[in-house]
UniProtKB/Swiss-Prot annotation:
GO MF term list: heme transmembrane transporter activity; siderophore uptake transmembrane transporter activity
Every TBDR beta-barrel domain range: 158-723
Keywords recorded for this protein, A-Z: Cell outer membrane, Membrane, Signal, TonB box, Transmembrane, Transmembrane beta strand, Transport
Biological role: Required for utilization of free heme at low concentrations.
Name this polypeptide is given: Heme/hemopexin utilization protein C
GO cellular component, one term: cell outer membrane
Motif position, TonB C-terminal box: 706-723
Organism: Haemophilus influenzae (strain ATCC 51907 / DSM 11121 / KW20 / Rd)
Family matches, as InterPro entries: Plug_dom, Plug_dom_sf, TonB-dep_rcpt-like, TonB-dep_rcpt_b-brl, TonB_haem/Hb_rcpt, TonB_Hb/transfer/lactofer_rcpt, TonB_rcpt_b-brl_sf, TonB_rcpt_CS
Length: 723
């Protein structure tokens, strides 16, 4: 079979020496997250298909939790889980699938809709990365790649079928997927389909999380045409649909209605009847403490809803890879569409958020003597359309619907300059972005320059140092720009008390400046012939300016009148909500990874810790994951056939919380076991069996800043048969 150099490079990088290695692969070459096909490219942290099959994770965030300072945010519902990288998550981490950005982001809902069965590998860049991907990459980048026929065909076969069935006991999750694929000298094609069905999730000690059942189904089609050795085109289409009944805030355990909030407010103010005024007037500090407790223990107002999320993406790729050092070109055209639909169970009120993204990416790399360049242009247009239902009861106080558009154009340049016989490598990069957002009545536009540089010093053949400086930014989202109407409200004394969104025309982009240094030691044949030992240590400090937060407050006039007269409208509830630049933050931490590997044995450990504080007040930041340390072992009982492993992870107590956060989080230890039967030859070479037992001792625990408990003991089994 004949494929271009790029196709072969992509395919061969997927091969791993150890099917169950949980540690980071530091030596493979990747061109997805870094956008850099040169031999000097920075190597991101990666989860291969083998490690994904072994772990049997149910979300991208779950699959990455073994990586230091990468944690799960969003609770225990898999659809709501998002990676938290060095204390930053949500729209501060860029999500990429097959080289294309995924921009859907709706507060307290999911945004990672790609099922694990359609993921071939995941790459993670930790730290600001706007010089590569533009707005949003303050915390880093999570890049996923779906499979093609070349990944799945074996031994020069021209046709194949892969069938997989998975099952997990914690929620009776059944995972079914089938792939059919074929290739010849010119063409390759893949068609995959999947269906996942889960019941309510079991947490530690046998408790059940209500309204965590779900269904997800969909498929992927890919077609490739190898025109000649230098030209290749690919067309892919992916479509998934997710269904569940859950609180509209997917991160909370149970629904929290306006009526429940109002009852708590009345009780706090000593109001026993709607027709009677409050009997107490709490101090500002008491009021602040009360409202923070409601938020941190229960979450925001959230009604039980039937939810559907259709998600689709179409991508056209063209690769030009002639035998020319100046040309290594990739062009991608794409169209993404995501719709989030909700209907309240009791009242039937409907909401809908629809985001369409169309764009083009152009990238080329050139080798000029001893200098490598990678450069490109990105353009994307986001269009959002929202619907927000109202009524006179449970949907009386709602945000207004809004429609808006956003256009972003970015140009970037990466250079690699080796010096002193490649003992020293200087890699500067820069990106310029121009963006505008507009509704029918308002338009905003701005631009931003994001520089970065990396210095690598190879001291000896077993020691090297890397120093980085990266800048990043996040432009205000369309929701932050254009949301209006009521945030929440209550009716007491026959009066409506309404908290309303207030537009902020002076909202500035968030910016980050990150400094980090890494030391990497690596030895071959250290204790015995053929063994390998690696240890890597990183320290980082990320200064983030102009954090955008939603602030709830009273204006001076309302506060004064409320203090003088408790019956004044606004005395019970703050009147205003506004997105503001209110925090200058510092995120700093360390990461340690070590691995020792022989032909059959792999020992590994990793440690990650992030501290976050407000630089102005010194107060701890919210949503910073607890420090964690993990140790593990993998051993091939039968070489090239049967491997077993175990990991023990200790999560430290998280007591560094903001002053108005009423909850701290105790420490806990989780123990996981795994085994894989995957013979490389013989009559069962087409069969792979994976078994995992997570949270072996059924610990009851709650991750830091989560509003619900984590998954209890969970036995997992997966069978894959290919022919």
């Amino acid at each position: 079979m004949r494929f271009s150099k790029l196709s072969l490079a992509i395919t061969t990088t997927l091969v791993t020496a150890n099917a169950l290695a949980q540690s980071v692969e530091l030596d493979s070459i990747n061109v997805i997250a870094t956008r850099d096909p040169s031999r000097f490219a920075y190597t991101p942290e990666k989860q291969s298909k083998d490690s994904l099959l072994s772990k049997q994770a149910t979300s991208v965030a779950d699959a990455l939790e073994d990586i230091p300072n990468v944690d799960v945010r969003g609770g225990s519902r898999s659809i709501a889980q998002k990676p938290n990288i060095r204390g930053l998550s949500d729209n501060r981490v860029v999500q990429v699938i097959d080289g294309v950005r995924q921009n859907f982001d709706l507060a307290h809902r999911g945004s990672y809709f790609l099922p694990m069965s359609l993921i071939q590998e995941i790459e993670v860049i930790k730290g600001p990365s706007s010089s590569l991907w533009g707005s949003g990459a303050l915390g880093g980048v999570v890049a996923m790649r779906t499979p093609n026929a070349l990944d799945l065909l074996k031994n020069n076969d021209k046709f194949g079928v892969k069938i997989r069935q998975g099952y997990q006991t914690a929620n009776n999750l059944s995972e079914k997927d089938v792939s059919v694929f074929a290739a010849n000298d010119k063409f390759d094609v893949l068609i995959s389909g999947f269906y996942n069905n889960a019941d309510n999730l079991r947490t530690g000690k046998g408790n059940k999380l209500n309204n965590t059942a779900y269904k997800q189904f969909g498929g992927l089609a890919k077609f490739g045409w190898q025109i000649n050795d230098a030209n290749r085109v690919e067309l892919s289409h992916r479509e998934t649909r997710f269904k569940q009944t859950a609180p509209s805030n997917n991160e909370v355990e149970n629904e929290l209605t306006n009526e429940q909030i109002t009852d708590q407010i009345k009780k706090f103010h000593g109001q026993k009847d709607d027709l009677l005024p409050p009997t107490t007037q709490p101090s500002p500090s008491e009021r602040s403490e009360f409202y923070s407790k409601v938020k941190t223990r229960l979450g925001s107002v959230s009604y039980l809803t039937d939810q559907q999320i259709p998600d689709q993406s179409t991508v056209f790729n063209y690769y030009l890879t002639p035998d020319n050092p100046y040309l290594n070109t990739h062009i991608a055209l794409y169209n993404n569409k995501t719709i989030e639909k909700e209907q309240r169970k009791v009242s039937g009120v409907k909401d809908q958020t629809k985001l369409t993204t169309r764009g083009i990416n152009l990238r080329n790399s050139s080798e000029l003597s001893h200098i490598s360049f990678v450069y490109g242009v990105d353009y994307m247009r986001d269009k959002i359309r929202t619907e927000r239902g109202t009524n006179g009861s449970d949907a009386k106080f709602r945000a207004d619907p809004y429609n808006a558009n956003s256009n972003t154009t970015g140009v970037y340049l990466i250079a690699h300059i080796p010096l002193f016989g490649e003992k020293l490598l200087v890699s500067p990069s820069v990106r310029y972005d121009h963006y505008d957002t507009s509704s029918k009545t308002v338009k905003y536009k701005d631009n931003h320059l994001s520089p970065a540089t990396k210095l690598t010093w190879i001291v000896t053949n077993w020691l090297d140092f890397t120093a980085k400086y990266n800048e990043a930014f996040r432009a205000p989202s369309m929701q932050e720009r254009f949301v209006s109407g009521a945030h929440f409200g209550a009716n007491t004394l026959g009066l409506d008390h309404i908290n309303r969104f207030v537009a902020n025309p002076n909202l500035r982009p968030e910016t980050a400046k990150n400094k980090e240094i890494t030391a990497n030691l690596h030895f071959d044949s250290l204790f015995k012939q053929g063994d390998k030992f690696k240890i890597e240590a990183t320290y980082f400090r990320n200064d983030v300016k102009d954090f955008i937060n939603l602030k709830i407050f009273n204006d001076a006039k309302t506060s004064a009148s409320a203090g003088a007269n408790p019956n004044t409208n606004g005395a019970l509830l703050p009147k205003n909500s506004q997105y503001q630049n209110i925090t200058n933050a510092r995120l700093s931490g360390i990461e340690l990874q070590a691995q020792y590997q022989t032909e059959r044995l792999t020992l590994f450990t990793n440690y990650g810790s992030t501290k976050g504080k407000d630089k102005d007040s010194g107060e701890a930041l919210s949503n910073i994951a607890a420090s964690k340390i993990g140790v593990g072992v993998n051993y091939a009982l039968v070489k090239d056939k049967f491997t077993v492993g175990a990991t023990v992870t200790h999560y430290a107590a998280q007591r560094r919380v903001p002053k108005d956060h009423s909850v701290t989080y105790p420490s806990y230890i989780l123990t996981d076991l795994r085994a894989t039967y995957a013979p490389l030859k013989g009559e069962w070479k087409n069969l792979r069996l994976d078994f995992a037992l997570e949270n072996l001792f059924d610990r009851k625990y709650q991750p830091a800043f989560s509003l619900m408990e984590g998954t209890g003991r969970n036995a997992k089994i997966s069978a894959v048969y290919s022919f």
